[in-house]
Each structure stands twice: as C-alpha cells, then as structure tokens.
C-alpha cells in the first residue's frame, strides 16, 4: 500500500456518515484544532478520529465502503472483515478502493462512554464530557489542550505551527491544563515557557 495516497475526507464528510451512530467519537490532530478555531488554518494530509476499541466494529460497519488496514511500526496489514484489531494495534486506516486513496485514520482508545483516557499515560483520566467539544456544526473534537499534549511528544514543524496559532486563543483553563501535563510528561518542553509568560 502507498502510505502517501491520501485523499482524506473532511470532518464534515465523516460526521455526515456517522450521524446515526450513537457511539462516542471525536476528531483529533490538526483538524481538531481547526474545528476549534472555526476555520481551516492549514492543509491537512489526513483525517484522524478516535473511537473506543470495543466500538470499532460498529464504525467499520457504518463506513463499509472502506477497506481497513492495521498500522504498526510503519507496516500495513489488511484487517479481514470480521476480525478485530489486536490489543497491540492502536491505529487503523480506511482505504477507498474506488478512489484508490486513504480516507480516514482511526485511533483506537481505551476510554469508556463516560471517561477519556490519555493513551500515552493511562493514569490520566478525565470525564469525556470535559475533553470533547462540539464545533458550530456539531462535529465532536478533542479539546485543544489535549490535542496539543499529543503533539508535544515529537514536535514537527506543523505541530509547532499549530501551537503558535492556538496559543493566543487558549483559555486560562486550557493553558493551565496543558502546562500541568507538559510538566508531568515532558518537563523540558519549550512550550511551557510560552504558556506561562
């Protein structure tokens, strides 16, 4: 598979397809920040969203026009129609054979209907309602502080750009949340100084 063959759906396209599925999900990554901004601030090569691991079969059924491939350490494996991703799989890409392109990147999370769990440190748990917001058009997205925490681990130029654009608009609460968790997980991160000055 060509990992660069992306023609990603927009969050609006995804939301329309999932509108009748009563299970928690939310857009993450760069698109989550743009949903928070209320406008697209940069190009996006993919569309990432999270679902609870146990709910993946329902999402797969709803997005039945796609073929799904597990992704681990840069390797892609076709996920047979009725198989579940292994416990060591946290990412599944959806491929549109008609368009010959990837459409979505599905992140499998460990949370419950009520709780959000940070996958890189499962001791970080919050009520899901506190971590997920809705765009003006009703699309669920991960709140900006948590999105930026994910981006802090291996900060690429686009992640730095996302942070720079987000910083002036972060609420005091989001700034403090991000500072607290950066100090815990990435205590030398340069964003801490930006957030506290």
Functional labels for PLM-detected ranges:
Residues 1-197:
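Compositionally biased terminal segments of proteins
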